[in-house]
């Protein structure tokens, strides 16, 4: 795992700090894969995700429902910055209802999964995937009644998440990660699952680069 703040680190730290007892919810994209790979689920009904349906914006509404049904449980929605834009207005609902859900934004300033495909399979012809437009998710979240922090290091995330666990109202953590972070393994377009490949396989096809 790379040094510094990354999607896998965030998910593993959430698992550690919740002792595996959280209800995890996801949006759609790279963060969804990391949430599936790096949180060690051992109990039923603790991962709420729309699977392969591609429903960006699903997670926050699902987290509101999960928190309403389980007021004494820790509910964490894992979102990308692209997904957060789809349904972030529902933070106002969570604030009005005083729901202590935790919204963790894995913010790489791109539509990460689509951009990864463009990198690996379309010669880095990036189209409609860059979101680096300066939107301040902390201020947006605060405007809708949530507590919010931006974090750029592992230490900052750990402190922010500890504070989020103690909060009685919605808490948003905007985690800044590298735009080129990738999720592995991958399956190329039109290929079967038994031809999936990881980063080492991919680098071998690129001459080790």
Predicted regions and their residues:
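Conserved thiamine diphosphate
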Residues: 69-160
């Amino acid at each position: 795992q790379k040094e510094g703040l990354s999607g896998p680190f965030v998910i593993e730290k959430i698992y550690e700090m919740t002792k595996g007892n959280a209800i995890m919810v996801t949006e759609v994209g790279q963060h969804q894969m990391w949430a599936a790979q790096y949180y060690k689920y051992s109990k039923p009904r603790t991962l709420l995700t729309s699977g392969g349906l591609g429903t960006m914006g699903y997670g926050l509404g699902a987290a509101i429902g999960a928190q309403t049904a389980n007021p004494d449980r820790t509910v964490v929605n894992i979102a990308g910055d692209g997904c957060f834009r789809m349904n972030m207005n529902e933070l106002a609902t969570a604030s009005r209802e005083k729901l202590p859900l935790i919204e963790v934004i894995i913010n790489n300033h791109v539509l990460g999964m689509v951009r990864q495909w463009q990198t690996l399979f379309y010669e880095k012809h990036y189209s409609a995937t860059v979101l680096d437009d300066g939107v301040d998710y902390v201020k947006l979240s605060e405007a809708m009644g949530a507590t919010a922090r931006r974090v750029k290091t592992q230490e900052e995330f750990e402190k922010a998440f500890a504070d989020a666990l103690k909060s009685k109202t919605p808490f948003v953590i905007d985690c800044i990660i590298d735009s080129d972070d990738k999720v592995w393994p991958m399956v190329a377009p039109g290929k079967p699952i038994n031809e999936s490949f990881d980063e080492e396989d991919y680098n071998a096809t690129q001459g080790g680069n």
